[in-house]
């Protein structure tokens, strides 16, 4: 009772079992702890709400926080989220009934989806980033992944843009589906139960982005597509997945005996891809045509060992020019244990390893990049 309102949960649920006269009933109690904009309503959990504004715009400029309570689908509408907006999502398992078979099933509730001619435009600023996270602001939930599903840009959606944004505590960060388009600028995606960024036959451009504590892959690119990453840092410390996975395959059966192929083109400049395991880049090309997995890395720090063995992709480093293949002895970051992925000011291997990109003059913190020999990764060293 002595805590400020800002740390009160937005939604509280309690499941009660009531026994009376030999009967048993189950009751769900719900309470709301803060004044907020609940979408589609305070009673939207377990439901799907589609918003259509006939090609217009829906601007989330209310000073109150926004709570996605259920599944929110944007169609034929540009959802514009201005700087400083706080978006919380109430996740959890929901129950539904298949209309054909009549059988019930459970699914992960709580996500934002963009479909058809919908478009997501997030316009945060360095001083006032837009934050997507779970709806439990209490300190004990701060480091818990998988509390809501994530952001899903479905097939064919164009013009999606996310700038100066933090996405955390979800199952996935952002998924971009077939022929969908996304530009990321100054975005952080972390503390996810699955992959941070997923592209499936998609078009993604990212600059000055940071991915870490993603239990799956930090960056996962499947079934081809076009991808460009500049000054990005993707790490995978203490988890099983690699910092980067790239594939031109879509499995059509459980054992992937049946599959489809689509060309992948990926370009990385001034990026850092590292983690605790010896291999932080994973490749899969099921075609004998090497051009269907077309990738190049320039002025990047990577970490590979088994990937470049004769029975894998021994030619990888020839497409990584110039690159530094990191070892456990190499220092890059200031404090991995504290999730501080700024560069060590004394001995970071990323120091002055980059090449100038005229269109990107500042780092994720807003520091000016060296015009002649910038640092690799999303942060520039400040001496």
Residue ranges of model-derived segments:
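Beta-solenoid repeat scaffold
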Residues: 60-61, 74-86, 92, 97-99, ...
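Predominantly extracellular beta-rich ligand-binding scaffolds that present long acidic/polar faces
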Residues: 208-342
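Right-handed parallel beta-helix
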Residues: 135-153, 157-214
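Feature for long, exposed domains in two main contexts
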Residues: 1-52, 56-60, 64, 72
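Surface-exposed loop/turn segments connecting beta-strands in extracellular beta-rich domains
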Residues: 89-90, 135, 168-171, 190-194, ...
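Buried hydrophobic-core signal for structured, non-transmembrane domains
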Residues: 12-19, 151, 165, 346-350
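C-terminal accessory segments
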Residues: 323-383
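All-beta strand scaffolds that present successive hydrophobic residues in beta-strands
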Residues: 60, 79-81, 119-124, 159-163, ...
């Amino acid at each position: 009772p002595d805590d400020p309102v800002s740390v009160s949960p937005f939604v509280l649920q309690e499941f009660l079992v009531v026994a009376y006269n030999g009967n048993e009933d189950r009751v769900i109690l719900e309470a709301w702890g803060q004044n907020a904009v609940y979408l589609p309503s305070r009673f939207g959990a377990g439901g799907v709400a589609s918003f259509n504004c006939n090609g217009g715009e829906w601007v989330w400029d209310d000073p109150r926080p926004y709570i996605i309570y259920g599944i929110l689908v944007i169609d034929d509408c540009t959802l514009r989220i201005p700087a400083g907006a706080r978006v919380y999502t109430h996740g959890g398992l929901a129950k539904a009934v298949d209309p054909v078979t009549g059988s019930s099933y459970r699914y992960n509730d709580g996500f934002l989806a963009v479909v058809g001619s919908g478009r997501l435009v997030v316009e945060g600023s360095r001083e006032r980033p837009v934050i997507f996270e779970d709806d439990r602001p209490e300190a004990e939930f701060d480091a818990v992944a998988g509390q809501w599903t994530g952001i899903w840009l479905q097939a064919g959606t164009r013009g999606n843009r996310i700038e100066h944004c933090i996405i955390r505590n979800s199952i996935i960060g952002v998924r971009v589906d077939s022929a969908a388009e996304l530009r990321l600028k100054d975005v952080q995606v972390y503390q996810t139960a699955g992959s941070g960024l997923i592209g499936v036959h998609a078009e993604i451009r990212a600059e000055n982005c940071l991915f870490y504590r993603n239990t799956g892959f930090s960056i996962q690119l499947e079934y081809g597509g076009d991808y460009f990453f500049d000054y990005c840092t993707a790490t995978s410390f203490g988890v099983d997945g690699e910092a980067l996975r790239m594939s031109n395959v879509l499995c059509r059966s459980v054992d992937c005996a049946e599959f489809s192929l689509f060309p992948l083109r990926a370009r990385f400049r001034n990026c850092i891809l590292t983690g605790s395991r010896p291999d932080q880049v994973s490749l899969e090309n099921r075609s004998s045509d090497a051009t269907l997995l077309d990738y190049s890395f320039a002025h990047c720090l990577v970490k590979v060992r088994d990937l470049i063995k004769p029975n894998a992709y021994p030619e990888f480093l020839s497409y990584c020019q110039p690159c530094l293949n990191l070892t456990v002895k190499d220092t890059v970051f200031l404090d991995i244990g504290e999730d501080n992925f700024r560069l060590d000011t004394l001995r970071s291997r990323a120091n002055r390893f980059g090449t100038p990109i005229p269109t990107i003059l500042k780092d994720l913190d807003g520091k000016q990049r060296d015009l002649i020999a910038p640092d690799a990764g999303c942060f520039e060293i400040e001496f």
